[in-house]
Structures are given as C-alpha cells and as structure tokens.
Design a protein with these regions (language model features):
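Short acidic active-site motifs
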Residues: 33-36, 157-160, 206-210
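Glycine-rich phosphate-binding loops that contact phosphosugars or nucleotide phosphates
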Residues: 1-142, 176, 211, 216-271, ...
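Short gly/ser/thr-rich secondary-structure transition/capping motifs
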Residues: 24-32, 152-156, 200-205
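Acidic catalytic cores of enzymes that act on phosphate-bearing nucleotides/polynucleotides
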Residues: 165-232
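Conserved phosphate/anionic-ligand binding catalytic regions in large, soluble enzymes, centered on
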Residues: 13-14, 183-185, 189-192, 279, ...
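Short, structured loop/turn "capping" segments at alpha-beta junctions
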Residues: 127-130, 158, 197
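A short, well-structured juxtamembrane/interface segment
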Residues: 150-167
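Long, charged amphipathic helices and adjacent flexible linkers at domain junctions
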Residues: 136-140, 146-155
Length: 283
C-alpha cells in the first residue's frame, strides 16, 4: 500500500489486520520510497491511494509497479481523477465530499476500505469463514457508531481546557501500538489546521533523546489506547508532571479525575481502535 500523508497513515492503520486475515506480509510505504526501492517479490500487488486522485508521487509509484509487472489498484475518493489511469483496477473510497482540505472522513473511510477489501479477499480465498467475516464487520460498525459521541465529548473537553490550550505553541503527540497511525495522523491534522509547532513520536522512540527538550512551556498529548504499553505511557506522563512541570493531556478510556484529560468509554476493540482515537485530534 502506497500513499502520502493521510493516505499513508490510513494504510499503516489497516496494515496489521490485513496481514492477519490475508495471512501474508503487507507493507505500507511512502510512494517516493517505494519508487526508489530495488528488491521486490514478483507476486506483489500494489494499492496506490490518493484521496484527491492527483498525487504525482503515488502515480509514479503505481507506474513503477506496472513496469515491474505487478498488479496495481488505483484508489481515490474522487472520480475522474488522473490516478485512475495508472492502475489495472479502480477502487473508490466512497465517503462523499470532504468539505475541508485536511482529510477527516478520508482517513477513516480509507482505513475501512482497505480492511473490507482484505476481508473480502480472505473470505474468497477461504482464509476466514463467513461467520468471521460477519463478526469483523459487526465489530467495525460498533467502533464507528461511537464516532459522533466521541466528537461531542471532545468539543466539551476543549471548551473546558480552551484557555490553557490557546497558550500552546509547542506540542508533542505521543502514541504507540495499534494507535501509532492515529498519532501520526493527529499530528498532521493539528499541523494543517492549527498551524503551530507540533511533533508526533512513537512512545519508545520519544524516550530515545527527545524527552530532554521538554520544559514547563511544553504541551504533551498522549494517545492512550488499551494495550501492553498503557501503564508505561502513564508513567511517562507522571514523570513530566513531577520533574518538568509540562502541560499534560490524556486521551483515555480510564477515569483519571483530571479535567485536563479527555476521558471517554472507547470500545477499545484493539483491531478497530484506530477508528476512534483519531477523532479527538480531528475535532
């Protein structure tokens, strides 16, 4: 799967579940990196996603794939776009109109499109049963159904913390595990919409030197989905509160009794958590 920006993040978000159901290695790559690579498996399928359908790098990546004899699928959310002519097959991300430049529906819609594509292929190849297919769709729907409530809770949380957040000029977003893609996409959304200095890091990578630059003027946003690193990210937050006196905000399922934290009863289905934890950073 190749794509830039939101398209890449959507591919990364879908990757693990696609690998699981397809029982094969799945890669998410920036198009320009893929274009310059040299060693490939000859039985490769390349899915090139460009939401607006005009990404020159995604088109170049698809052309590279075709030149190597690979199967290609051109994906876009807008019909009649140039990218359609560079794939053997067209696959539309059917989300309707995106009314703002920064993609929101496009991110979630692309994740769902990648996943359902994988479910259908896996079912056809008898790698999953019809019951498993139906269960994946049911769980996906349950996760997506919570999105409006998450958005409403986020708006209330923002109004509570608006005065503090308006002072922010340097923000770090920290994430991990199944919501790594949400951290990356959330960082991009804040850059595009708020337009001040923001950086995003995977939890362990952040601990390799970056933490040295945190001080009392730094704002920290922790994307705290359930999982094996949940306690570790809470310890990191406590350290910065006690030692660096930074401004700290959690996105979490667990009641912290702290008005700075966005607490919501996320369904926390680990395979579909990416559909939920991104919403606060989109709003």
């Amino acid at each position: 799967m190749i794509g830039s920006g939101t398209s890449y993040h959507a591919a990364l978000a879908a990757k693990n579940l696609m690998e699981k159901v397809l029982q094969m290695k799945v890669f998410a790559s920036y198009p320009i990196v893929f274009k310059d690579e040299r060693i490939f498996n000859k039985n490769t399928l390349v899915m090139g996603l460009s939401h607006a359908g005009m990404s020159a790098s995604t088109i170049a990546g698809l052309d590279k794939a075709k030149a190597n004899g690979f199967g290609t699928i051109a994906m876009t959310a807008e019909k009649g776009r140039p990218v359609e002519h560079h794939g053997d097959v067209k696959l539309y991300v059917d989300i309707g109109e995106e009314k703002a430049g920064p993609k929101t529906k496009g991110y979630i819609g692309s994740i769902v499109t990648f996943m359902i594509f994988a479910f259908k292929v896996a079912l056809r190849q008898e790698k999953i049963t019809q019951d498993e297919f139906d269960d994946y769709l049911r769980r996906m729907q349950a996760s997506a159904d919570a999105i409006p409530d998450i958005a409403e809770a986020t708006s209330k949380w923002y109004l509570q913390n608006r005065n503090d957040l308006m002072k922010c000029r340097r923000l770090y977003v920290i994430g991990y595990d199944n919501c790594l893609a949400d951290m990356m996409e959330g960082t991009l959304k804040i850059c595009e919409a708020v337009r001040y200095s923001v950086q995003g890091f995977e939890l362990e990578e952040f601990m390799h030197g970056i933490y040295h630059c945190i001080d009392e003027d730094t704002y920290m946003l922790y994307v705290c989905s359930k999982g094996q690193y949940y306690d570790r990210i809470l310890r990191l937050k406590r350290y910065f509160e006690e030692e660096r006196h930074s401004h700290n905000f959690l996105i979490t399922h667990e009641n912290t009794n702290n008005s700075k934290d966005l607490v919501f009863p996320f369904t926390d289905d680990q395979e579909f958590a990416v559909l939920q934890y991104i919403v606060p950073m989109q709003v």
